């Protein structure tokens, strides 16, 4: 993922742990099958990459939402979601932040290449351009099947939370992805994040490297 910094945000005492070591020391809760929406467990720290991104003054970080809890899905809106997911996955070439920017984590809107969080940011921008509310388009951090940090875009709908993923053509409901969901943007304010895991002693201070591998 890319780095995002909101002016005025100060993060102290962050633990530098790899995703694999984090998974080994914490009992994360995986999605329960047939659960339409991911449960939220209070505020948590945003990814450092996102904090840096916001610190560059990106409009993505400024919305104050909470007006719409879920997108009403019709055949038309679902078609738009599928088109955006396919277009971005096809247009953008996968590349790590280290390859592109010579840093471990850097969030930005990609032009022709990017890491997982860049795909998600661009999909969010395109969907907002089609009239979708930012309230339901949520940047999300997960652990993948290899317990590595990964970023996706969650869209909250009346049919459940669905995931737009640069690694997959199919748009799956969150509980069908095989991922462990850690945290995502708040629907109330973009630069606030909420935990998707029950409160744990170190949950609010751990930062997880995201997107060390693009594919």
Task: Give the predicted meaning of each segment.
Residues 5, 18-21:
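Generic extreme N-terminus detector
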Residues 21-215:
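A structural boundary/capping signal
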Residues 1-9:
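Bacterial N-terminal signal peptides that target proteins for export
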Residues 8-16:
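Bacterial N-terminal signal peptides
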């Amino acid at each position: 993922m890319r780095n995002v910094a909101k002016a005025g945000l100060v993060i102290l005492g962050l633990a530098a742990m790899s995703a694999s070591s984090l998974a080994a020391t914490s009992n994360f809760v995986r999605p329960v099958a047939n659960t339409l929406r991911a449960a939220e467990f209070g505020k948590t720290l945003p990814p450092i990459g996102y904090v840096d991104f916001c610190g560059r003054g990106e409009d993505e970080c400024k919305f104050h939402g909470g007006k719409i809890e879920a997108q009403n899905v019709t055949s038309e809106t679902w078609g738009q979601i599928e088109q955006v997911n396919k277009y971005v996955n096809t247009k953008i070439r996968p590349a790590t932040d280290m390859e592109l920017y010579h840093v471990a984590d850097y969030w930005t809107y990609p032009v022709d290449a990017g890491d997982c969080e860049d795909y998600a940011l661009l999909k969010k921008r395109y969907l907002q351009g089609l009239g979708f509310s930012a309230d339901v388009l949520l940047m999300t951090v997960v652990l993948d099947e290899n317990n590595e940090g990964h970023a996706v875009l969650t869209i909250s709908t009346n049919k459940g939370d669905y995931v737009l993923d640069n690694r997959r053509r199919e748009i799956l409901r969150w509980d069908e992805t095989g991922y462990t969901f850690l945290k995502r943007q708040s629907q109330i304010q973009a630069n606030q994040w909420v935990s998707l895991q029950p409160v744990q002693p170190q949950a609010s201070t751990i930062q997880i490297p995201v997107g060390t591998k693009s594919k």
